[in-house]
Amino acid sequence: MSSLVSEIARRRTFAIISHPDAGKTTLTEKLLWFGGAIQVAGEVRARKADRHATSDWMELEKQRGISVTSSVMQFPYSRESADGKAQENIVNLLDTPGHEDFSEDTYRTLTAVDSAVMVIDSVNGVEAQTIKLLNVCRLRDTPILTFINKLDREGRSPIELLDEIEDVLQIQCAPMTWPIGMGKAFRGVYHLIDDKVQLFDPHGDKGTAAILDGLDNPELDRILGSQAEELRIEIELVRGASHTFDKAAFLNGKQTPVYFGSAINNFGVQSLLDALCELSPPPLARNTESRVVEPQEPKFTGFVFKIQANMDPRHRDRIAFVRVCSGRFERGMKLLHVSAGKTVAINNAITFMAQDRNTTEEAYAGDIIGVPNHGTIRLGDVFTEGEPLKFTGIPSFAPEFFRRARLNNPLKVKQLQKGLQQLAEEGATQMFRPLASNDLVLGAVGILQFDVVAHRLEHEYGVDAIFESHECATARWLKGTPAEIEKLIAKAGHNVALDGAGDHVYLAPSMVNLRLTQERFPELQFLETREIV
C-alpha cells in the first residue's frame, strides 16, 4: 500500500491552455525536452514545417500547423525539491487543441487533469480562447499556473499584463519571476521567492547564461549596467503592490503563480516545470453519482475522456483514453466495463509519447492509459474492479453549426455511416439522424471540425462526402417521459432526431421556433449540454 501511495504522490497530470499562436506547442516541446522525453526540440513553423512538433501527429494537423486532437505524453522528471532533496516526478502532459474550433475536445481533456498551465502571449495579452478555456477550468476550480511567453519580443509591460489577467479573468496573480527588460533589451528574470537572478542567453544551453545570488550583488551592476538599478526599483514596487503566493488560494483556483520567459529560446521553461512539480497537486479525488473516489483507494477505477480513431492509419483501430482515478492498473487485469455490464481483460493497454506507443505493464492514479477497442467503448464509460460507478462531469455541448452529409458515390453509404458513427463516438463531431428522413446531419461547435471530418472520411474510410448547409439554429437534448417525447414527435417530428447514443434531440430551425416549442411543451426539458453517461 505504501508504494501505491508514494507512486500516486509523485504524479502530476496537467494540460496547457492558450489562444492559438501564443506558443503552446513550442512550450509543450520544450517541456518534453527539459524532461528528457525528446532529443531535439523541433520548432513548429505553422504550415511550412518540415520537422513537425512531436505532439501534432495527425496528417491534417501537419498540413495546417494546428493541434486538432489532444495528445498525451508521459515522462519522468528529476529535480531538487524546495527542501533540497532529489525528487523524481512522473509528468503526464495533455496537449489540447489551441484552435478555437476544437473547444469540445479541449473541454473534455480538461476533465482529466489536476492542474493547467495557461500560456499568455506578452504581445497580445489575454485573448478570446484563453477566456473560454479558463472558464472551463473554473467549473472544477482547477489550479492554474501562468506562463507569460515571448519576452524576447517587444510586448506589453508586465504590470499591464498582470492587471489584465486579474481584471478580465478574475483571478489573482502572484508573480514568481519578474522580467528584466523585454524585446532586444530582455536580459533575464529575477526569482522573487529565492532572490536569484537568472540571466538570458539565446545561444546558451537551455537559454540561460548564469544565475546570480541576490539583487544587491555588484556583479549584477557589472553585467546589466543601468538596468540593475531599474530592476531593484521595480522589484520593490512589485513586492509592495502584488499578491504574495498563497498555496491554498492556488489549489482552490483563486490565484495563479506567474512565470515569465521565452519558450522558443528555452528560457523560463525549467522554472515552470519545477514549479509545476513543486506546487501542483498530485491526483485529486473524483466525484461519481454515488460517492467520492479517492486516488489512494487500492482498487482500480478510471473513466474514458476521449476516443481517437485511427491513431495509426496502418492499424484501423480506435484508442479509448482512460484517466486512472484510483488504485493501480496491471497488464492483463480483468475490469468491469460498467455501461456494457461485461468484465474484460485489458491485455494491451498503452502509454503515450505522442506517436510512440508503449505497452503498459502498470499505471497509477493520475496516469492516462490507452485501451484499444473496436467500437464497444464510448466517451464517459467507466472501468472498475467490480463496483458499478459512474463518474460525473464529462459533457457534450449543443453544436452551433450543422451540415447535411451527401455522397458523390451512393454505393458508399455504408462506409459513410460507419465513418461518421466512429468519428461521432470519438467526439470529432456529433451525428444526428432526423426521424422524418434518411439524412445524416452533423453538428459541431466550430466550422473547422467539418473540414477535419471530410478529410478523415476521405483518407481513413475512402469516402468522398460533401457537406451541405442544413437549416438548423441549435440543438437541444430532450428530457421527459417517453409519452411526453412522443407527444412532441406527433406535433413536430420533422425537427426531432436521434443522436449517436440513440437519445432524442430537438433540432430547432430558429431560436424563435425553439422558444415557442418550449412554451408549447413545458413538461419537457430542452437541455443545452448533456452529460455523457
UniProtKB/Swiss-Prot annotation:
Domain of life per record: Bacteria
GO molecular function, one term: GTP binding
GO cellular component, one term: cytosol
GO biological processes: regulation of translational termination
Domain tr-type G, chain residue ranges per copy: 9-284
CDD domains documented for this protein: RF3, RF3_II, RF3_III
Binding positions for GTP per the UniProt entry: 18-25, 95-99, 149-152
Range of residues in the leader sequence: none
Keyword set, alphabetical order: Cytoplasm, GTP-binding, Nucleotide-binding, Protein biosynthesis
Chief localization: cytoplasm
Localization (cell): Cytoplasm
InterPro entries: EF-G-like_DII, EFG_III/V, G_TR_CS, P-loop_NTPase, PrfC, RF3_C, RF3_dom_3_sf, RF3_GTP-bd
UniProt-listed Pfam families: EF-G_D2, GTP_EFTU, RF3_C
PROSITE patterns attached to this UniProt entry: G_TR_1, G_TR_2
Main function: Increases the formation of ribosomal termination complexes and stimulates activities of RF-1 and RF-2. It binds guanine nucleotides and has strong preference for UGA stop codons. It may interact directly with the ribosome. The stimulation of RF-1 and RF-2 is significantly reduced by GTP and GDP, but not by GMP.
Family the entry assigns: Belongs to the TRAFAC class translation factor GTPase superfamily. Classic translation factor GTPase family. PrfC subfamily.
Protein name: Peptide chain release factor 3
UniProt source species: Cupriavidus taiwanensis (strain DSM 17343 / BCRC 17206 / CCUG 44338 / CIP 107171 / LMG 19424 / R1) (Ralstonia taiwanensis (strain LMG 19424))
